[in-house]
């Protein structure tokens, strides 16, 4: 099983965090369950392998569309996979569903909505088919980038301060003083929070909390043993009780239970580095 990440070209870097390809060379001999901590990035996914299912706070078992738009995930979720895995994806910046596609981000939180229903333009189906049929990994990534470039040239979107604020929260892993962002925005608190919710789908503070827990999960991913005081120090929690409370709220388990029981993808593949397209 292989998981690869690629960085976007400069013109799209305001909207795209990365592209990824996740695939298995052979069919799985039994159902595989992969879980993920809360996701602080929306995305677009093209499945060219076997159909699979999702379990999250909203859906006990959802048949995931072959191509879909994914909003933020505020709690841990699980994927149930069988057969051959073949998934190509675009990881978007936190506010990009709104900025790039003009979508109401809050409507997509915890959702996997069919791409053909969300974006009805004929070119969407054309690129989706090309991505499925492309044989090479780089070919699939280039087609995803071409798809976004096509849309970008049609709409010519511009980012604003909310995009910047959301990116700062994501890049700092939720470890920042919200007052600094508010002061820099030159907006009232109510206006800032309303505009942030409209473009990202969550309040700034809640988004920062999710991002920080995602960072913690990444620190312990694939490990069998960790130094917990060091982890909550790195994540800037004031005390262990606060750390455990937040972790349980967003994952449903204590940190030690999660470490022992989780089936994150990092347990099955090497942690990827982000490559440039050549």
Can you annotate each of these PLM segments?
Residues 1-171, 177-179, 184-189, 203, ...:
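Alpha-helical bundle regulatory/interaction domains
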Residues 177, 195-196:
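Extended amphipathic alpha-helical scaffolding segments in membrane-proximal extra-membrane regions
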Residues 190, 194-195, 202, 206-222, ...:
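Catalytic-pocket segment enriched in acidic/His residues
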Residues 198-202, 246-256:
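A secondary-structure capping/hinge motif
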Residues 210, 245, 261:
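Residue-level "edge-of-site" marker
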């Amino acid at each position: 099983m292989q998981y690869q990440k690629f960085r976007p070209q400069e013109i799209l870097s305001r909207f795209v965090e990365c592209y990824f390809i996740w695939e298995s060379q052979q069919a799985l001999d039994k159902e595989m369950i992969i879980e993920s901590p809360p996701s602080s990035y929306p995305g677009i996914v093209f499945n060219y392998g076997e159909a699979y299912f999702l379990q999250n706070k909203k859906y006990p078992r959802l048949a995931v569309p072959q191509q879909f738009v994914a909003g933020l995930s505020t709690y841990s979720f699980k994927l149930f996979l069988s057969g051959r895995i073949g998934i190509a994806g675009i990881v978007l910046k936190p506010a990009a569903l709104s900025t790039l596609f003009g979508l109401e981000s809050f409507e997509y939180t915890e959702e996997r909505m069919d791409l053909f229903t969300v974006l009805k333009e004929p070119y969407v189906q054309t690129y989706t088919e090309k991505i499925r049929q492309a044989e090479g990994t780089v070919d699939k990534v280039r087609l995803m980038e071409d798809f976004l470039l096509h849309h970008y040239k049609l709409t010519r979107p511009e980012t604003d301060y909310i995009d910047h604020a959301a990116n700062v929260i994501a890049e700092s892993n939720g470890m920042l003083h919200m007052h600094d962002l508010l002061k820099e925005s030159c907006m009232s608190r109510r206006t800032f929070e309303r505009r942030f919710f409209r473009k990202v789908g969550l309040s700034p503070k809640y988004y920062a909390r999710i991002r920080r827990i995602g960072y913690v999960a990444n620190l312990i991913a694939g490990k069998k043993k960790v130094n917990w005081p060091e982890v909550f120090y790195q994540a800037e929690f004031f005390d262990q009780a606060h750390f455990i409370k937040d972790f349980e709220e967003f994952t449903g388990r204590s940190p030690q239970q999660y470490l022992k029981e989780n089936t994150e993808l990092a347990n099955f593949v090497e942690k990827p580095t982000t490559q440039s397209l050549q």
